[in-house]
């Protein structure tokens, strides 16, 4: 059992924070280009600095700098803030957050009333940090957004976080992307989702889960709160998509389904096209990097033309679709008034495809920001070029300049908002 009163680590794994570093090391671990540490000017900064000294923990000046930014926002009277300590910043030096850093950070956040979002993506918090993240979810009743993607969290850390969410009633958005929680950790998340009544967006993509659709399918039959689910790189095959579709007949809440980078072929599209005939909640469907080919695209096109009027966005990027299937999708858009976003790059374009999508854009049926191609003419022939739009272009990386949250580059989140910055 976890000790809910003490902040010390348990006797077993995860281990206690390391012994105190030498004083010279503790004094400065990151500093701005000028070489001096930032001035301690705010409440969060002061708490963090003092707690590091009290616990003989090395001060991470990247964290200190980010707390300074939030302190300034708090001074302006702002609430509902996200503390962004992402470890993949291209604009400043970064010392990545470790599990021991997260131990200190979680202690100063657990009673903070101004912060309801925490982004620590691309750091090194591991299972040690996952333990303290789980405790934070138990104690911090304002947190609605937690981004832990790519943090070396394993099955044990995944289990701790999933179990913490059994009783949590505030968290709405969790990203576990890229943490290798494997099937063991995935089982705990599937079980949690049959109990949890608040989580609306969950990303378990690239977590080394294999054919997780049996358990997540059972979850979808029971859960009526989840709005967005990412299952990228789950090794889903046609039998897996059938299990998901069986669950979608009974689910009335899911609006965004991401099954990109799997092994779904045209046979799987038979099941999906059939469920789309009756499903009225699904609005965004990401099939990128599968292999549905012409036949799969035609199954979808027929349903979109004749039955479905709820789907708003479809991505079939890199699915080995040729002109026949791509033209069929374009024809369905002329009939279906709801489908507004279509992404097709990475397939096999012929001239008929180029003409068909050029005509959709010229007539205003397909807006330039709602697709990943644009038309141009050379010697009287129409061609398509790629543009940087998509459902989640800036999901795994940040541009070196410009905004990372352009609506056209991250259309999926614009189409299915949960609230605020989520």
Where do the PLM segments sit?
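Leucine-rich tandem repeat or coiled-coil scaffolds
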Residues: 1-422
């Amino acid at each position: 059992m976890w000790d809910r009163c003490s902040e010390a680590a348990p006797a077993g794994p995860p281990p206690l924070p390391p012994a105190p570093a030498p004083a010279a090391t503790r004094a400065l671990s990151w500093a701005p280009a000028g070489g001096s540490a930032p001035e301690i000017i705010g409440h969060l900064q002061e708490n963090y600095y003092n707690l590091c000294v009290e616990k003989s923990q090395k001060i991470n000046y990247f964290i200190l700098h980010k707390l300074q930014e939030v302190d300034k926002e708090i001074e302006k009277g702002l609430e509902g803030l996200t503390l962004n300590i992402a470890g993949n910043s291209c604009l400043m030096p970064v010392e990545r957050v470790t599990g021991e850093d997260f131990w200190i950070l979680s202690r100063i956040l657990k009673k903070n009333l101004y912060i309801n979002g925490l982004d620590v993506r691309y750091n090194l918090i591991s299972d040690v940090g996952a333990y303290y993240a789980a405790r934070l979810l138990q104690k911090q009743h304002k947190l609605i957004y937690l981004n832990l993607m790519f943090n070396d969290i394993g099955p044990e850390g995944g289990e701790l976080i999933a179990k913490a969410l059994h009783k949590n009633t505030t968290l709405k958005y969790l990203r576990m992307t890229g943490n290798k929680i494997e099937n063991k950790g995935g089982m705990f998340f599937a079980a949690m989702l049959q109990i949890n009544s608040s989580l609306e967006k969950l990303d378990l993509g690239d977590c080394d889960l294999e054919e997780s659709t049996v358990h997540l399918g059972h979850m979808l039959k029971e859960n009526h709160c989840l709005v967005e689910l990412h299952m990228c790189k789950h090794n889903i095959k046609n039998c897996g998509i059938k299990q998901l579709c069986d669950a979608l007949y009974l689910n009335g809440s899911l609006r965004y389904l991401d099954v990109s980078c799997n092994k779904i072929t045209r046979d799987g599209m038979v099941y999906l096209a059939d469920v789309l005939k009756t499903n009225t909640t699904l609005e965004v469907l990401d099939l990128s990097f599968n292999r549905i080919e012409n036949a799969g695209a035609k199954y979808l096109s027929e349903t979109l033309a004749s039955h479905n009027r709820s789907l708003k966005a479809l991505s079939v990027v890199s699915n080995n679709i040729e002109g026949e299937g791509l033209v069929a999708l374009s024809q369905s858009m002329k009939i279906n008034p709801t489908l507004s976003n279509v992404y097709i790059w990475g397939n096999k374009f012929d001239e008929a495809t180029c003409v068909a999508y050029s005509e959709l854009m010229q007539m205003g049926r397909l807006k330039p920001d709602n697709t990943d191609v644009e038309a141009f003419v050379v010697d009287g022939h129409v061609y398509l070029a790629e543009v940087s739009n998509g459902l989640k272009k800036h999901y795994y990386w940040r541009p070196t300049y410009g905004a990372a949250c352009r609506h056209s580059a991250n259309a999926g989140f614009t189409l299915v908002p949960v609230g605020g910055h989520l």
